[in-house]
Regions:
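Glycosyltransferase catalytic domains, chiefly GT-A lineage
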Residues: 1-138
């Protein structure tokens, strides 16, 4: 993902939430420009720690998604934040998606748009959360 963003985006900063020590160490050792690596202890708050034992590893990652966005908006001087799944790869600039957003809107989220034959909405929900944009205006 990092390399594809670097190739297609003129200006980006990636905030990576490392969910284990090995991931944190490896990412920090790469010294990649435009990347801030955030450890789990830095990020986890009382609410997350309370639900952590009740979730599988995957469920906990999903649970943390909205909190990662809030963490960046609250702790860094940014006017917007885009949540991007770690396995996303860009073949072009994501600006085309952002250009569809009206200035008065604060959130960009898209539905899955499954074909009827492959509809998994009941299991995965209506919205695709691998790319969600938030303005820091509320």
């Amino acid at each position: 993902m990092y390399e594809s963003l670097n190739r297609h985006c003129k200006d980006f900063h990636l905030y990576v939430f490392a969910f284990n020590d090995e991931c944190f160490s490896v990412l920090k050792s790469l010294y990649l420009a435009n990347m801030t690596v955030i450890s789990l202890p830095e990020f986890e708050d009382e609410e997350l720690l309370k639900v952590k034992p009740t979730r599988s590893r995957g469920e906990y990652c999903w649970t943390c998604s909205s909190s990662t966005i809030l963490y960046v908006l609250d702790n860094y001087d940014v006017d917007h934040c885009t949540y991007i799944d770690a396995d996303l790869y860009f073949f072009a600039s994501p600006q085309i998606l952002l250009d569809e957003m009206d200035e008065s809107e604060s959130v960009l989220i898209t539905p899955h748009r499954y074909t009827p034959q492959y509809d998994q909405s009941e299991k995965t929900g209506i919205y695709c959360v691998q790319f969600v944009y938030f303005r820091n205006n509320q």
